[in-house]
Amino acid sequence: MSEITSPHRSGSVAVIGRPNVGKSTLTNALVGAKVSIVSNRPQTTRHRLLGIATFPEGQLVLVDTPGLHREQKRAMNRVMNRAARGSLEGVDAAVLVIEAGRWDEEDTLAFRVLSDAGVPVVLVVNKVDRLKDKTALFPFLAQVSEGRTFAAVHPVSALKRKGLDALVGDLLKLVPEAEAMFGEDEITDRSQRFLAGELVREQLMRQLGEELPYATTVEIERFAEDGALLRIGAVIWVEREGQKAIVIGKGGTRLKEIGGKARLQMERLFGAKVFLETWVRVREGWSDDEAALKAFGYE
C-alpha cells in the first residue's frame, strides 16, 4: 500500500498587533532565526519585512509589521501605520498578536483593520509565561472572543517558543496548496545591508534613554566584502547636536558599546567576521519630514 502524504502548502500571513506585543519575537521564533530586531520599547519595528518559515509540510511567508497605533501627528507614525495596513494586501491569512491579560483600544483598532481586510484571523495570545495566575487566562480568552470571530486561538510564549507547533499547524491549514515561494535556506526578503542597519538601530533602542531612540535612524553607507571580512560603515542620524553628544557618550564610550554589540550580532547572523565603523550625524527634524523618511528607506 502506498503511503498517503499531505499536500504541500505555501502562503503569506500578516503578523498584526499594537506595539510591543511581541510580533517580531514571534516572527523570529517561527523562522528560527533573527530577521526582525527586538527590544522592550514600543515601535521598535519600523519597516515591513518578510520572515520565511519553512517546514516539511509547507512554507509560511510571515509579513512582520510595525505596531498599529493611534498616534498620527508625526510623519514617522503615519509611515509605520501605512506599512502595517499595507501588509494585508494579498495575504492568505493574518495573525493578531495580543498580550495575555490585556486588551486595549489599540488592540480593538488592530482587530477592526483585520476585519475590514476580510482574511481569516488567528488570535495569538502572547506572553502567557508572564501570567502569575494561569487560571485567569481562560476568562480572558472568553472575554476577547465575545463578539469577535477567529479561525483559531493560540496562547503562546514566543520568547520561550512554547505553543508554536500547534499554531504552525493551524496557519498551514489557512494557506493554499502550493509550491514554496522561497528556497529552504532563505529566511527573509531583506538584504544583509538592510539587516546590518537594523542591528545597529536595535542597540540604539536598547542602550539609549526613553525618548532618544525615536529620534535616531541608521543608514548603511558602505557594505563590502573584503575576502572573508565584511566591511560595514553605518551612519547614525539624530535630530539635534545635543542628541549626537549623548549617542557618542563621554570619550566615545557609548558609541563604541553600540557598535561592538551590533557587530557581534552581525557576525552571528551573517556567519562572517565584520569590521564595523560608526558615525553620528545631525539632520534636524528628519522623523517628521516625509522626504527625509523616503530618503532613509521608509515606505
From Swiss-Prot:
GTP binds at residues 17-24, 64-68, 126-129. Residues 17-24 are annotated as: G1. One of its GO terms (biological process) is ribosomal small subunit assembly. The keyword S-adenosyl-L-methionine does not apply. Residues 200-284 form the KH type-2 domain. Residues 156-158 are annotated as: G5. Keywords: Cell inner membrane, Cell membrane, Cytoplasm, GTP-binding, Membrane, Nucleotide-binding, Ribosome biogenesis, RNA-binding, rRNA-binding. Residues 126-129 are annotated as: G4. It holds the Pfam family KH_2. Residues 64-67 are annotated as: G3. Residues 9-177 form the Era-type G domain. Residues 43-47 are annotated as: G2. An essential GTPase that binds both GDP and GTP, with rapid nucleotide exchange. Plays a role in 16S rRNA processing and 30S ribosomal subunit biogenesis and possibly also in cell cycle regulation and energy metabolism. Monomer. PANTHER family: GTPASE ERA, GTPASE ERA, MITOCHONDRIAL. Belongs to the TRAFAC class TrmE-Era-EngA-EngB-Septin-like GTPase superfamily. Era GTPase family. This is GTPase Era. The lineage of its organism: Bacteria, Pseudomonadati, Pseudomonadota, Gammaproteobacteria, Lysobacterales.
